[in-house]
């Protein structure tokens, strides 16, 4: 990669030549401060900041000399308002990664210095620390719609989008389907009642089926609907719910609400947000999952259920009436789609996933936002690398379903090879470093005490930033919830989380990870479900017996729950 290409790729706004650094400490410091201030003024209205340090005279034998230079750069950057920027060093110094970590550990700057190393002439650059990039100054905790200004809409629309506890835009833009065909207004909906079934009905028929019409009317009249209970539970604990996220990212479609008929029907059937679980094809059998969403669960479920269960169920489940049914129904919506959520099963193993990407590429719909929930154990299919696809799209967010590290992670998500997961992440950093990646753990009683250690481990390895974690609180199955813990264990968890938050909060400008741990404390203390502990141990031992495992050999801290 040439210097010119780097300027273009990373929107470089200036360079500083370190050959100007001299033995005169004060003179050099004053010079460097002026250079930083000049760059700052030049990019005052920009959303990111990169400072390139030229390699002249920067390759030094003494770690101390290089450290002094870098430390002074950090001090100077702290004197300049860089709250909306990040600083990035490109250097030929082979010790850059080690020294950058030392300097960052001494700094309280929430926007730390980051580094790229190159062996020379800015060729073959490898990422040693993922650059902090807030190019849109995205505010995770804000519920305001991203694509419209609330001051520009009517007072009624403003109320629906920002104040109503019941309104959600999803029923006007979206349908969700399981691999078994059950359809819902979204993936957060409670599982009963179903809103239709794609094995007997088309998506368009479900669109104005009575449950959907009733839900829309409930939302507009401010009535609670049991379908939305999980989002309300999340909001009560302080989590940013799926409902709030829907209004934030899709609230610009509020005009569709005005066209709702008296019976709740909506004539306009154009799905701008997709979340169709094409099948249950998966290579893992996670503890919190089951046969509906994982084909690997089939044999275990047959042993657990016994009787005629195996005769009455199939390994692979598909959402439509045949393998092409869902695809054929979605094609007309390709002109309208703005965002696609890929989950599973395991989406990176599904041909339907790559079929959609191929069609988007063919139509040059690189503006479609791609969001993933993936176990991140496979990143290609039949020679097709998903990394090469992701590089082409304007916005890709990859949430890796990783609950714990090492043996714990392999136990909770059975079939995982932890070394492969870490290698996949390193390859992703090399091939498509600009793609948003975050850990998306399911917080359960099994990983609750270990999650902070896992989080810090990946940050220290340079695989994620501290902010790159999105806690998904497990609500079902209920016997895995963190609120089954007794008071003493909850107190221990809260203490561990409070300590972790002290480390995290100053490094989390997005505030997403911080909210996750804070809300988890609220969530577990809100309810006493200790009566489910017996169920937890019984279900765990049953599965351990089938899989020839023993949970306390892997997660010994759970002995405290006995």
Map each language-model feature to its residues:
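A short, well-structured beta->alpha microelement
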Residues: 2-3, 32-45, 49-52, 57, ...
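Structural motif
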Residues: 16-23, 53-56, 62, 89-94, ...
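Short, aromatic/basic amphipathic alpha-helical patches
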Residues: 25-39, 63-66, 98-107, 384-389, ...
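Recognition helices and adjacent regulatory flanks at domain boundaries
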Residues: 237-273, 282-284, 305
């Amino acid at each position: 990669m040439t210097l010119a290409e780097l300027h273009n790729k990373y929107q470089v706004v200036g360079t500083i030549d370190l050959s100007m650094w001299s033995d005169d400490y004060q003179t050099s410091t004053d010079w460097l401060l002026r250079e930083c201030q000049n760059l700052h003024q030049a990019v005052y209205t920009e959303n990111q900041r990169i400072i390139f340090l030229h390699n002249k005279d920067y390759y030094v034998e003494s770690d101390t000399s290089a450290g002094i230079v870098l430390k002074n750069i950090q001090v100077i950057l702290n004197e300049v308002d860089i709250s909306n920027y990040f600083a990035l060093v490109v250097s030929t110094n082979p010790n850059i990664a080690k020294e950058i970590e030392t300097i960052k550990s001494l700094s309280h700057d929430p926007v730390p210095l980051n580094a790229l190393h190159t062996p020379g002439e800015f060729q073959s650059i490898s990422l040693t620390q993922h650059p902090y990039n807030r190019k849109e100054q995205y505010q995770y905790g804000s519920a305001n719609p991203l694509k419209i200004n609330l001051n520009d809409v009517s007072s009624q629309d403003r109320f629906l989008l920002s104040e109503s506890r019941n309104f959600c835009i999803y029923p006007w833009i979206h349908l969700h389907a399981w691999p078994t065909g059950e359809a819902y207004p979204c993936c957060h909906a409670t599982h009963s009642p179903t809103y239709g079934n794609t094995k007997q009905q088309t998506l368009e028929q479900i669109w104005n089926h009575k449950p959907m019409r009733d839900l829309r009317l409930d939302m507009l009249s401010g009535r609670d609907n049991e379908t939305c209970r999980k989002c309300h539970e999340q909001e009560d604990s302080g989590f940013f719910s799926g409902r709030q996220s829907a209004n934030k990212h899709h609230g610009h479609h509020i005009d569709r609400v005005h066209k709702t008929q008296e019976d709740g029907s909506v004539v306009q059937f154009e799905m701008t947000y997709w979340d169709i679980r094409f099948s249950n094809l998966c290579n893992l059998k996670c503890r919190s999952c089951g046969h509906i969403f994982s084909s690997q669960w089939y044999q275990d479920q047959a042993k657990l259920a016994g009787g005629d269960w195996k005769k009455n169920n199939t390994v692979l489940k598909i959402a439509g009436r045949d393998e092409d049914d869902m695809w054929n129904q979605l094609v007309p919506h390709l002109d309208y789609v703005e965002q696609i959520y890929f989950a599973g099963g395991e989406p990176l193993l599904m041909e339907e996933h790559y079929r959609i990407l191929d069609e988007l590429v063919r139509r040059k719909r690189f503006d479609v936002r791609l969001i993933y929930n993936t176990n991140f154990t496979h990143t290609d299919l039949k020679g097709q690398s998903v990394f090469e696809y992701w590089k082409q799209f304007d916005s890709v967010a990859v949430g890796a379903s990783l609950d714990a590290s090492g043996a714990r992670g392999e136990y909770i998500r059975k079939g995982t090879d932890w070394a492969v997961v870490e290698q996949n992440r390193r390859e992703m950093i090399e091939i498509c470093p600009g793609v948003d990646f975050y850990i998306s753990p399911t917080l359960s009683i099994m990983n609750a005490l270990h999650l902070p250690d896992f989080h810090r481990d990946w940050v220290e390895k340079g695989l994620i930033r501290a902010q790159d974690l999105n806690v998904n609180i497990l609500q079902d199955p209920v016997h895995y919830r963190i609120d089954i813990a007794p008071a003493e264990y909850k107190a221990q968890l809260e203490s561990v989380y409070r300590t972790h938050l002290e480390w995290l909060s100053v490094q989390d400008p997005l505030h997403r990870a911080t909210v996750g741990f804070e809300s988890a404390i609220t969530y577990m203390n809100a309810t006493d479900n200790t009566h489910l502990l017996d169920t937890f141990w019984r279900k765990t031992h049953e599965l351990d017996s089938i899989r020839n495992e023993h949970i306390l050999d892997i997660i010994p801290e759970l002995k405290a729950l006995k």
